[in-house]
Amino acid sequence: MLLFINRFAKTIILLFGMLVFLVLLGLGGAALYFKDNAAKLYIDTRKSIDSSFDSSQAFIDTYNGSSSKFSVESINKQIEEVKKKVEESTKKLEEYEKQINQAKGLNGYLVSPEKLKELQEAKKSLQATKSQIEKYANTLKTANNGKTGQNGTSSSTIPITKISGSTISVSTRDTNGKTNSALKDIQEFSTQANDIIKQYKEIKNKIPTEKQFNEYYTIGAITLVSVSGGVLAVLIVSTVMTFLGSKKLGLRTFSRLTSTDQIADHVNDILDRYPELEDAVLEELDQ
């Protein structure tokens, strides 16, 4: 009974191991087969983030390199463009994260926990950036709505001479000679805007480039296929060789190559365990 249980347990473990490596081999094969789709999704996400960064950088560069007068409406319009890009980037990151979560069995072997953590941090940074941009837009909108010119109409033109580093150089009065109350509300804009750029740079540095992604993905998939396929092949070959090279006598299985020696050893073990049986056998042989 114990012999049967032992043999049954070994068979179950062998079959389970083969099934596990077969699944891993299938996942690796699927990863290679859908490589182009995975790369396209990643590239789209990366391009969206890069586009958002470029839009934000251009927005700041426009102010830094200009000595013209900008209207609140113009600023709001550009902020809305940047906000739109951030929302697109956030959506792309969420789609990428969703794809990973839907295929944990595959990507769990191809994407390290550190990279998944960086993806979460990148998404949080984008969400924080979006909140900041909305705050800036609301501040400017409130300032603009509260400003009236000499003729009682809204005056939205703000003489900004330069934004550089964390400083905004501005005129303290509008073209009509009245103090522009909106200036106070946007004095911190340069520092905040540069914070946005800094956040984007951190995001860009955390996310692998297109070339790096293809290298990581391909190496991970090939490694998964090679290791799982190799182990599975060894298990199958060893099982077949064991089956072809063995024969069963009673409840015991012996190797065809060394069956005589194995049977002799087995008989000796029985005789050593039961001395009276050995005496009976010897008496029978002497007759």
From Swiss-Prot:
Subcellular location: Cell membrane
Keyword Ubl conjugation tagged: no
GO cellular component, one term: plasma membrane
Pfam family, one: MG280
The UniProt record lists the keyword Transmembrane: yes
Keywords: Cell membrane, Membrane, Transmembrane, Transmembrane helix
Major subcellular site: membrane
Name of the molecule in the record: Uncharacterized protein MG280 homolog
Membrane topology per record: Multi-pass membrane protein
Endpoints of the signal sequence: none
